[in-house]
């Protein structure tokens, strides 16, 4: 079991590392490529577009051909794309490399969740996904620090050499450590109960959890996107204060994420999901009424705690009905989360909604919709029948 957890964690970490590690080198990258920092900030959107593109195909391929081939190819693409970014001499080539990095990271991300669905029951899966969420919260804190240390002695290209090395390590883990977990053919007596056709993506329970996780990701990405404006422009923080504040909020996320597995031993998953949405609602109300920086910071802290306590549980429930189509389900969740959050941020920008109101709106909207879905759509017998661990060791 340890090999699956190690490989899943490594596969997921490519996604946040690809976002956060290069940011510290952005001014030098812009200078060397004769582009403005504003022009290169589109690299974030390009990276997410690459992830979404990969997710369109990676899940189905993983269900048909196996998790291991997709993981190996994804890591290889990430590694080669990182090298392409390091060799870029102008902006368009750099953005092409960023898109391909997203493709590689997206494929690995989908496979990681499919592997966990294949190998863990619902209770253990919720705990592991909460831990995974805590680990991914470490990356936005550590990656810029590592990047800064690298750039003290080496040029910005070294950041992408480092990411390329990460791709190589993940590829080697996938090749030599990871075992195939894709479900084998079912016996004829099981086909009517568990078949790809029976595991529909349009069942009410999956759609409800897809909506909850998409709204939750929209909350956290809106927070990340709006935080520079809120903290430095509205609240008057310096860059140093901003970095410290974001590190502290990431610390809150880590503590809550690592505590959630223990909470799952005491409370039902539904209870933790309601607590999560209650924290979002409280954060929205707090931010709307805040008149001091201290109260605003308290509201922002509630956002991180709310996301960390509920997201892993909701993701685990969303994957539960899919013993044979975990790859497709994981892809669908990933695409909805990336596209849904991007759509909200884009619409809010087009409508001229301020950063604070953008955040308050998604917090209150997410909490109300999610609480209604949690109460109105509960796991039924059909979902329970598919909640099985299909993995069996292969020679």
Swiss-Prot record:
<comment type="similarity">
    <text>Belongs to the major facilitator superfamily. DHA1 family. MdtL (TC 2.A.1.2.22) subfamily.</text>
</comment>
<dbReference type="InterPro" id="IPR023697">
    <property type="entry name" value="Multidrug-R_MdtL"/>
</dbReference>
<keyword id="KW-1133">Transmembrane helix</keyword>
<feature type="transmembrane region" description="Helical">
    <location>
        <begin position="93"/>
        <end position="113"/>
    </location>
</feature>
<keyword id="KW-0472">Membrane</keyword>
<feature type="transmembrane region" description="Helical">
    <location>
        <begin position="4"/>
        <end position="24"/>
    </location>
</feature>
<dbReference type="InterPro" id="IPR020846">
    <property type="entry name" value="MFS_dom"/>
</dbReference>
<protein>
    <recommendedName>
        <fullName>Multidrug resistance protein MdtL</fullName>
    </recommendedName>
</protein>
<feature type="transmembrane region" description="Helical">
    <location>
        <begin position="271"/>
        <end position="291"/>
    </location>
</feature>
<feature type="transmembrane region" description="Helical">
    <location>
        <begin position="328"/>
        <end position="350"/>
    </location>
</feature>
<dbReference type="Pfam" id="PF07690">
    <property type="entry name" value="MFS_1"/>
</dbReference>
<feature type="transmembrane region" description="Helical">
    <location>
        <begin position="355"/>
        <end position="377"/>
    </location>
</feature>
<feature type="transmembrane region" description="Helical">
    <location>
        <begin position="158"/>
        <end position="178"/>
    </location>
</feature>
<feature type="transmembrane region" description="Helical">
    <location>
        <begin position="69"/>
        <end position="89"/>
    </location>
</feature>
<feature type="transmembrane region" description="Helical">
    <location>
        <begin position="295"/>
        <end position="315"/>
    </location>
</feature>
<feature type="transmembrane region" description="Helical">
    <location>
        <begin position="217"/>
        <end position="237"/>
    </location>
</feature>
<keyword id="KW-0997">Cell inner membrane</keyword>
<feature type="transmembrane region" description="Helical">
    <location>
        <begin position="42"/>
        <end position="62"/>
    </location>
</feature>
<dbReference type="GO" id="GO:0022857">
    <property type="term" value="F:transmembrane transporter activity"/>
</dbReference>
<dbReference type="InterPro" id="IPR011701">
    <property type="entry name" value="MFS"/>
</dbReference>
<keyword id="KW-1003">Cell membrane</keyword>
<keyword id="KW-0812">Transmembrane</keyword>
<feature type="transmembrane region" description="Helical">
    <location>
        <begin position="247"/>
        <end position="267"/>
    </location>
</feature>
<keyword id="KW-0813">Transport</keyword>
<dbReference type="GO" id="GO:0005886">
    <property type="term" value="C:plasma membrane"/>
</dbReference>
<dbReference type="InterPro" id="IPR036259">
    <property type="entry name" value="MFS_trans_sf"/>
</dbReference>
<feature type="transmembrane region" description="Helical">
    <location>
        <begin position="131"/>
        <end position="151"/>
    </location>
</feature>
